[in-house]
């Protein structure tokens, strides 16, 4: 974790601008993810003639690479400093675009084309984990650890914004110039971000002796578990709300997803100081309560307006969960390990979103679509109970943390 430079207290617009000037590099990395997201499955399946399995695998490779590389990103950020990690990650995003370009050149050889696409996706996953983790830590190093919750919140906002912009923009690029046009756009975004990052001043890496990974995991895993349980609510909304509306015979699933996104981003913008004022665990418990009500409304909805209100409340509730628990998780370790702590904590959400889809799909096949929202509400209730326990008995007092220290 970088050592923040001592400076006068920041607040308001100046603080937000300082944070945005750093998290824009995470925006760039997620834009390179969003650009090919709506294009590559169709390209692999329709243009190259591969099965739906291979089309899905090409997309999933990036998520697996992100999941596996994220702990390394945190550790290297602690040792080398976050700016170097961000630049490294953005270079990975650039190379992913190069992989797409080479795949287009090799389109006459389908297997080589597929291998190059897969390689580009793996490199993109690694690049995103480094750019995302590094930009958060760089932002904290610039504005100070007091504002870590706000830095994490802004990172989430730019992530959603980049993904929302990237998908339609990628479709336009593909319609304009094919896979080559898409690849050049990805490379251009990443290269511009690298050129903007290089002149910016870096923050010093902390020189303290780092804890071993097992000790870091012992300090943050309970916070990560609460995050994983709460992420199930987001997972079932994002993945299955369209099927839910179809099963009910309703229109408006796309609008429901828009409501979720507006509630998610709006809550982060409306309550930027909530975590500092109330404390991370208190905010998390309030958020869990709102998310539970929202999921129960969706699961029991008899009319479309009930489902829409439920989706809105779920978005509001889930919005501050990640930064609220993340602030406490990161502060549970020494400064020289806070990069590793943030990365390890984030892995729990990655894993949760990875398994929520298949497991919820099995439950849906067995018991129907509405049941998955009731089940998700139960998981969020477990997160609420776990967080209440953490408030009463922090991990530093728990045997598993003590034995790892």
UniProtKB/Swiss-Prot annotation:
CDD domains: MFS_YfcJ_like. Keywords: Cell inner membrane, Cell membrane, Membrane, Transmembrane, Transmembrane helix, Transport. It is a multi-pass membrane protein. One of its GO terms (cellular component) is plasma membrane. It comes from the Bacteria. It is found in: Cell inner membrane. This is Uncharacterized MFS-type transporter YhhS. It comes from Salmonella typhi. The gene is yhhS.
């Amino acid at each position: 974790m970088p050592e923040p430079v001592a400076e006068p207290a920041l607040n308001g617009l100046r603080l937000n601008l300082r944070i945005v000037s750093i998290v824009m590099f995470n925006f760039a990395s997620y834009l390179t993810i969003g650009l090919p997201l709506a294009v590559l499955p169709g390209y692999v399946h329709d243009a190259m003639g591969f099965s739906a399995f291979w089309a899905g695998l090409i997309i999933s490779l990036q998520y697996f690479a992100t999941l596996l590389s994220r702990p390394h990103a945190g550790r290297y950020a602690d040792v080398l400093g976050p700016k170097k990690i961000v630049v490294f990650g953005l270079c990975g995003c650039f190379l992913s675009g190069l992989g797409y370009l080479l795949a287009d050149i090799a389109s006459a050889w389908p297997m080589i084309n597929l291998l190059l696409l897969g390689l580009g996706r793996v490199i993109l996953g690694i690049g995103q984990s480094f750019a995302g983790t590094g930009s958060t830590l760089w932002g904290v190093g610039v504005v100070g650890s007091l504002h870590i919750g706000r830095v994490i919140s802004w990172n989430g906002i730019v992530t959603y914004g980049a993904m929302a912009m990237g998908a339609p923009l990628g479709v336009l690029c593909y319609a304009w110039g094919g896979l080559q046009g898409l690849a050049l756009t990805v490379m251009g975004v990443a290269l511009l971000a690298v050129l903007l990052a290089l002149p910016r001043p870096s923050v010093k890496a902390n020189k303290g002796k780092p804890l071993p990974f097992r000790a870091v995991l012992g300090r943050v895993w309970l916070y990560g578990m609460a995050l994983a349980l709460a992420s199930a609510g987001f997972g079932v909304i994002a993945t299955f709300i369209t099927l839910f509306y179809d099963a009910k015979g309703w229109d408006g699933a796309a609008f429901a997803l828009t409501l979720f996104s507006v509630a998610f981003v709006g809550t982060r913008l409306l309550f930027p100081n909530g975590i500092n004022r109330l404390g991370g665990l208190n905010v998390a418990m309030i958020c869990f309560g709102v998310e539970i009500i929202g999921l129960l409304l969706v699961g029991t909805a008899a009319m479309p307006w009930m489902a829409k209100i439920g989706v809105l409340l779920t978005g509001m509730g889930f919005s501050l969960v990640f930064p609220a628990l993340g602030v406490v998780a990161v502060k549970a370790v020494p400064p020289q390990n806070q990069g590793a702590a943030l990365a390890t904590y984030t892995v729990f959400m990655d894993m949760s979103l990875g398994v929520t889809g298949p497991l919820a799909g099995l439950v849906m096949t067995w018991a129907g679509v509405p049941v998955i929202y009731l089940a998700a509400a139960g998981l969020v209730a477990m997160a609420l109970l776990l967080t209440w326990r953490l408030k009463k008995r922090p991990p530093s007092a728990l045997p598993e943390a003590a034995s790892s220290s």
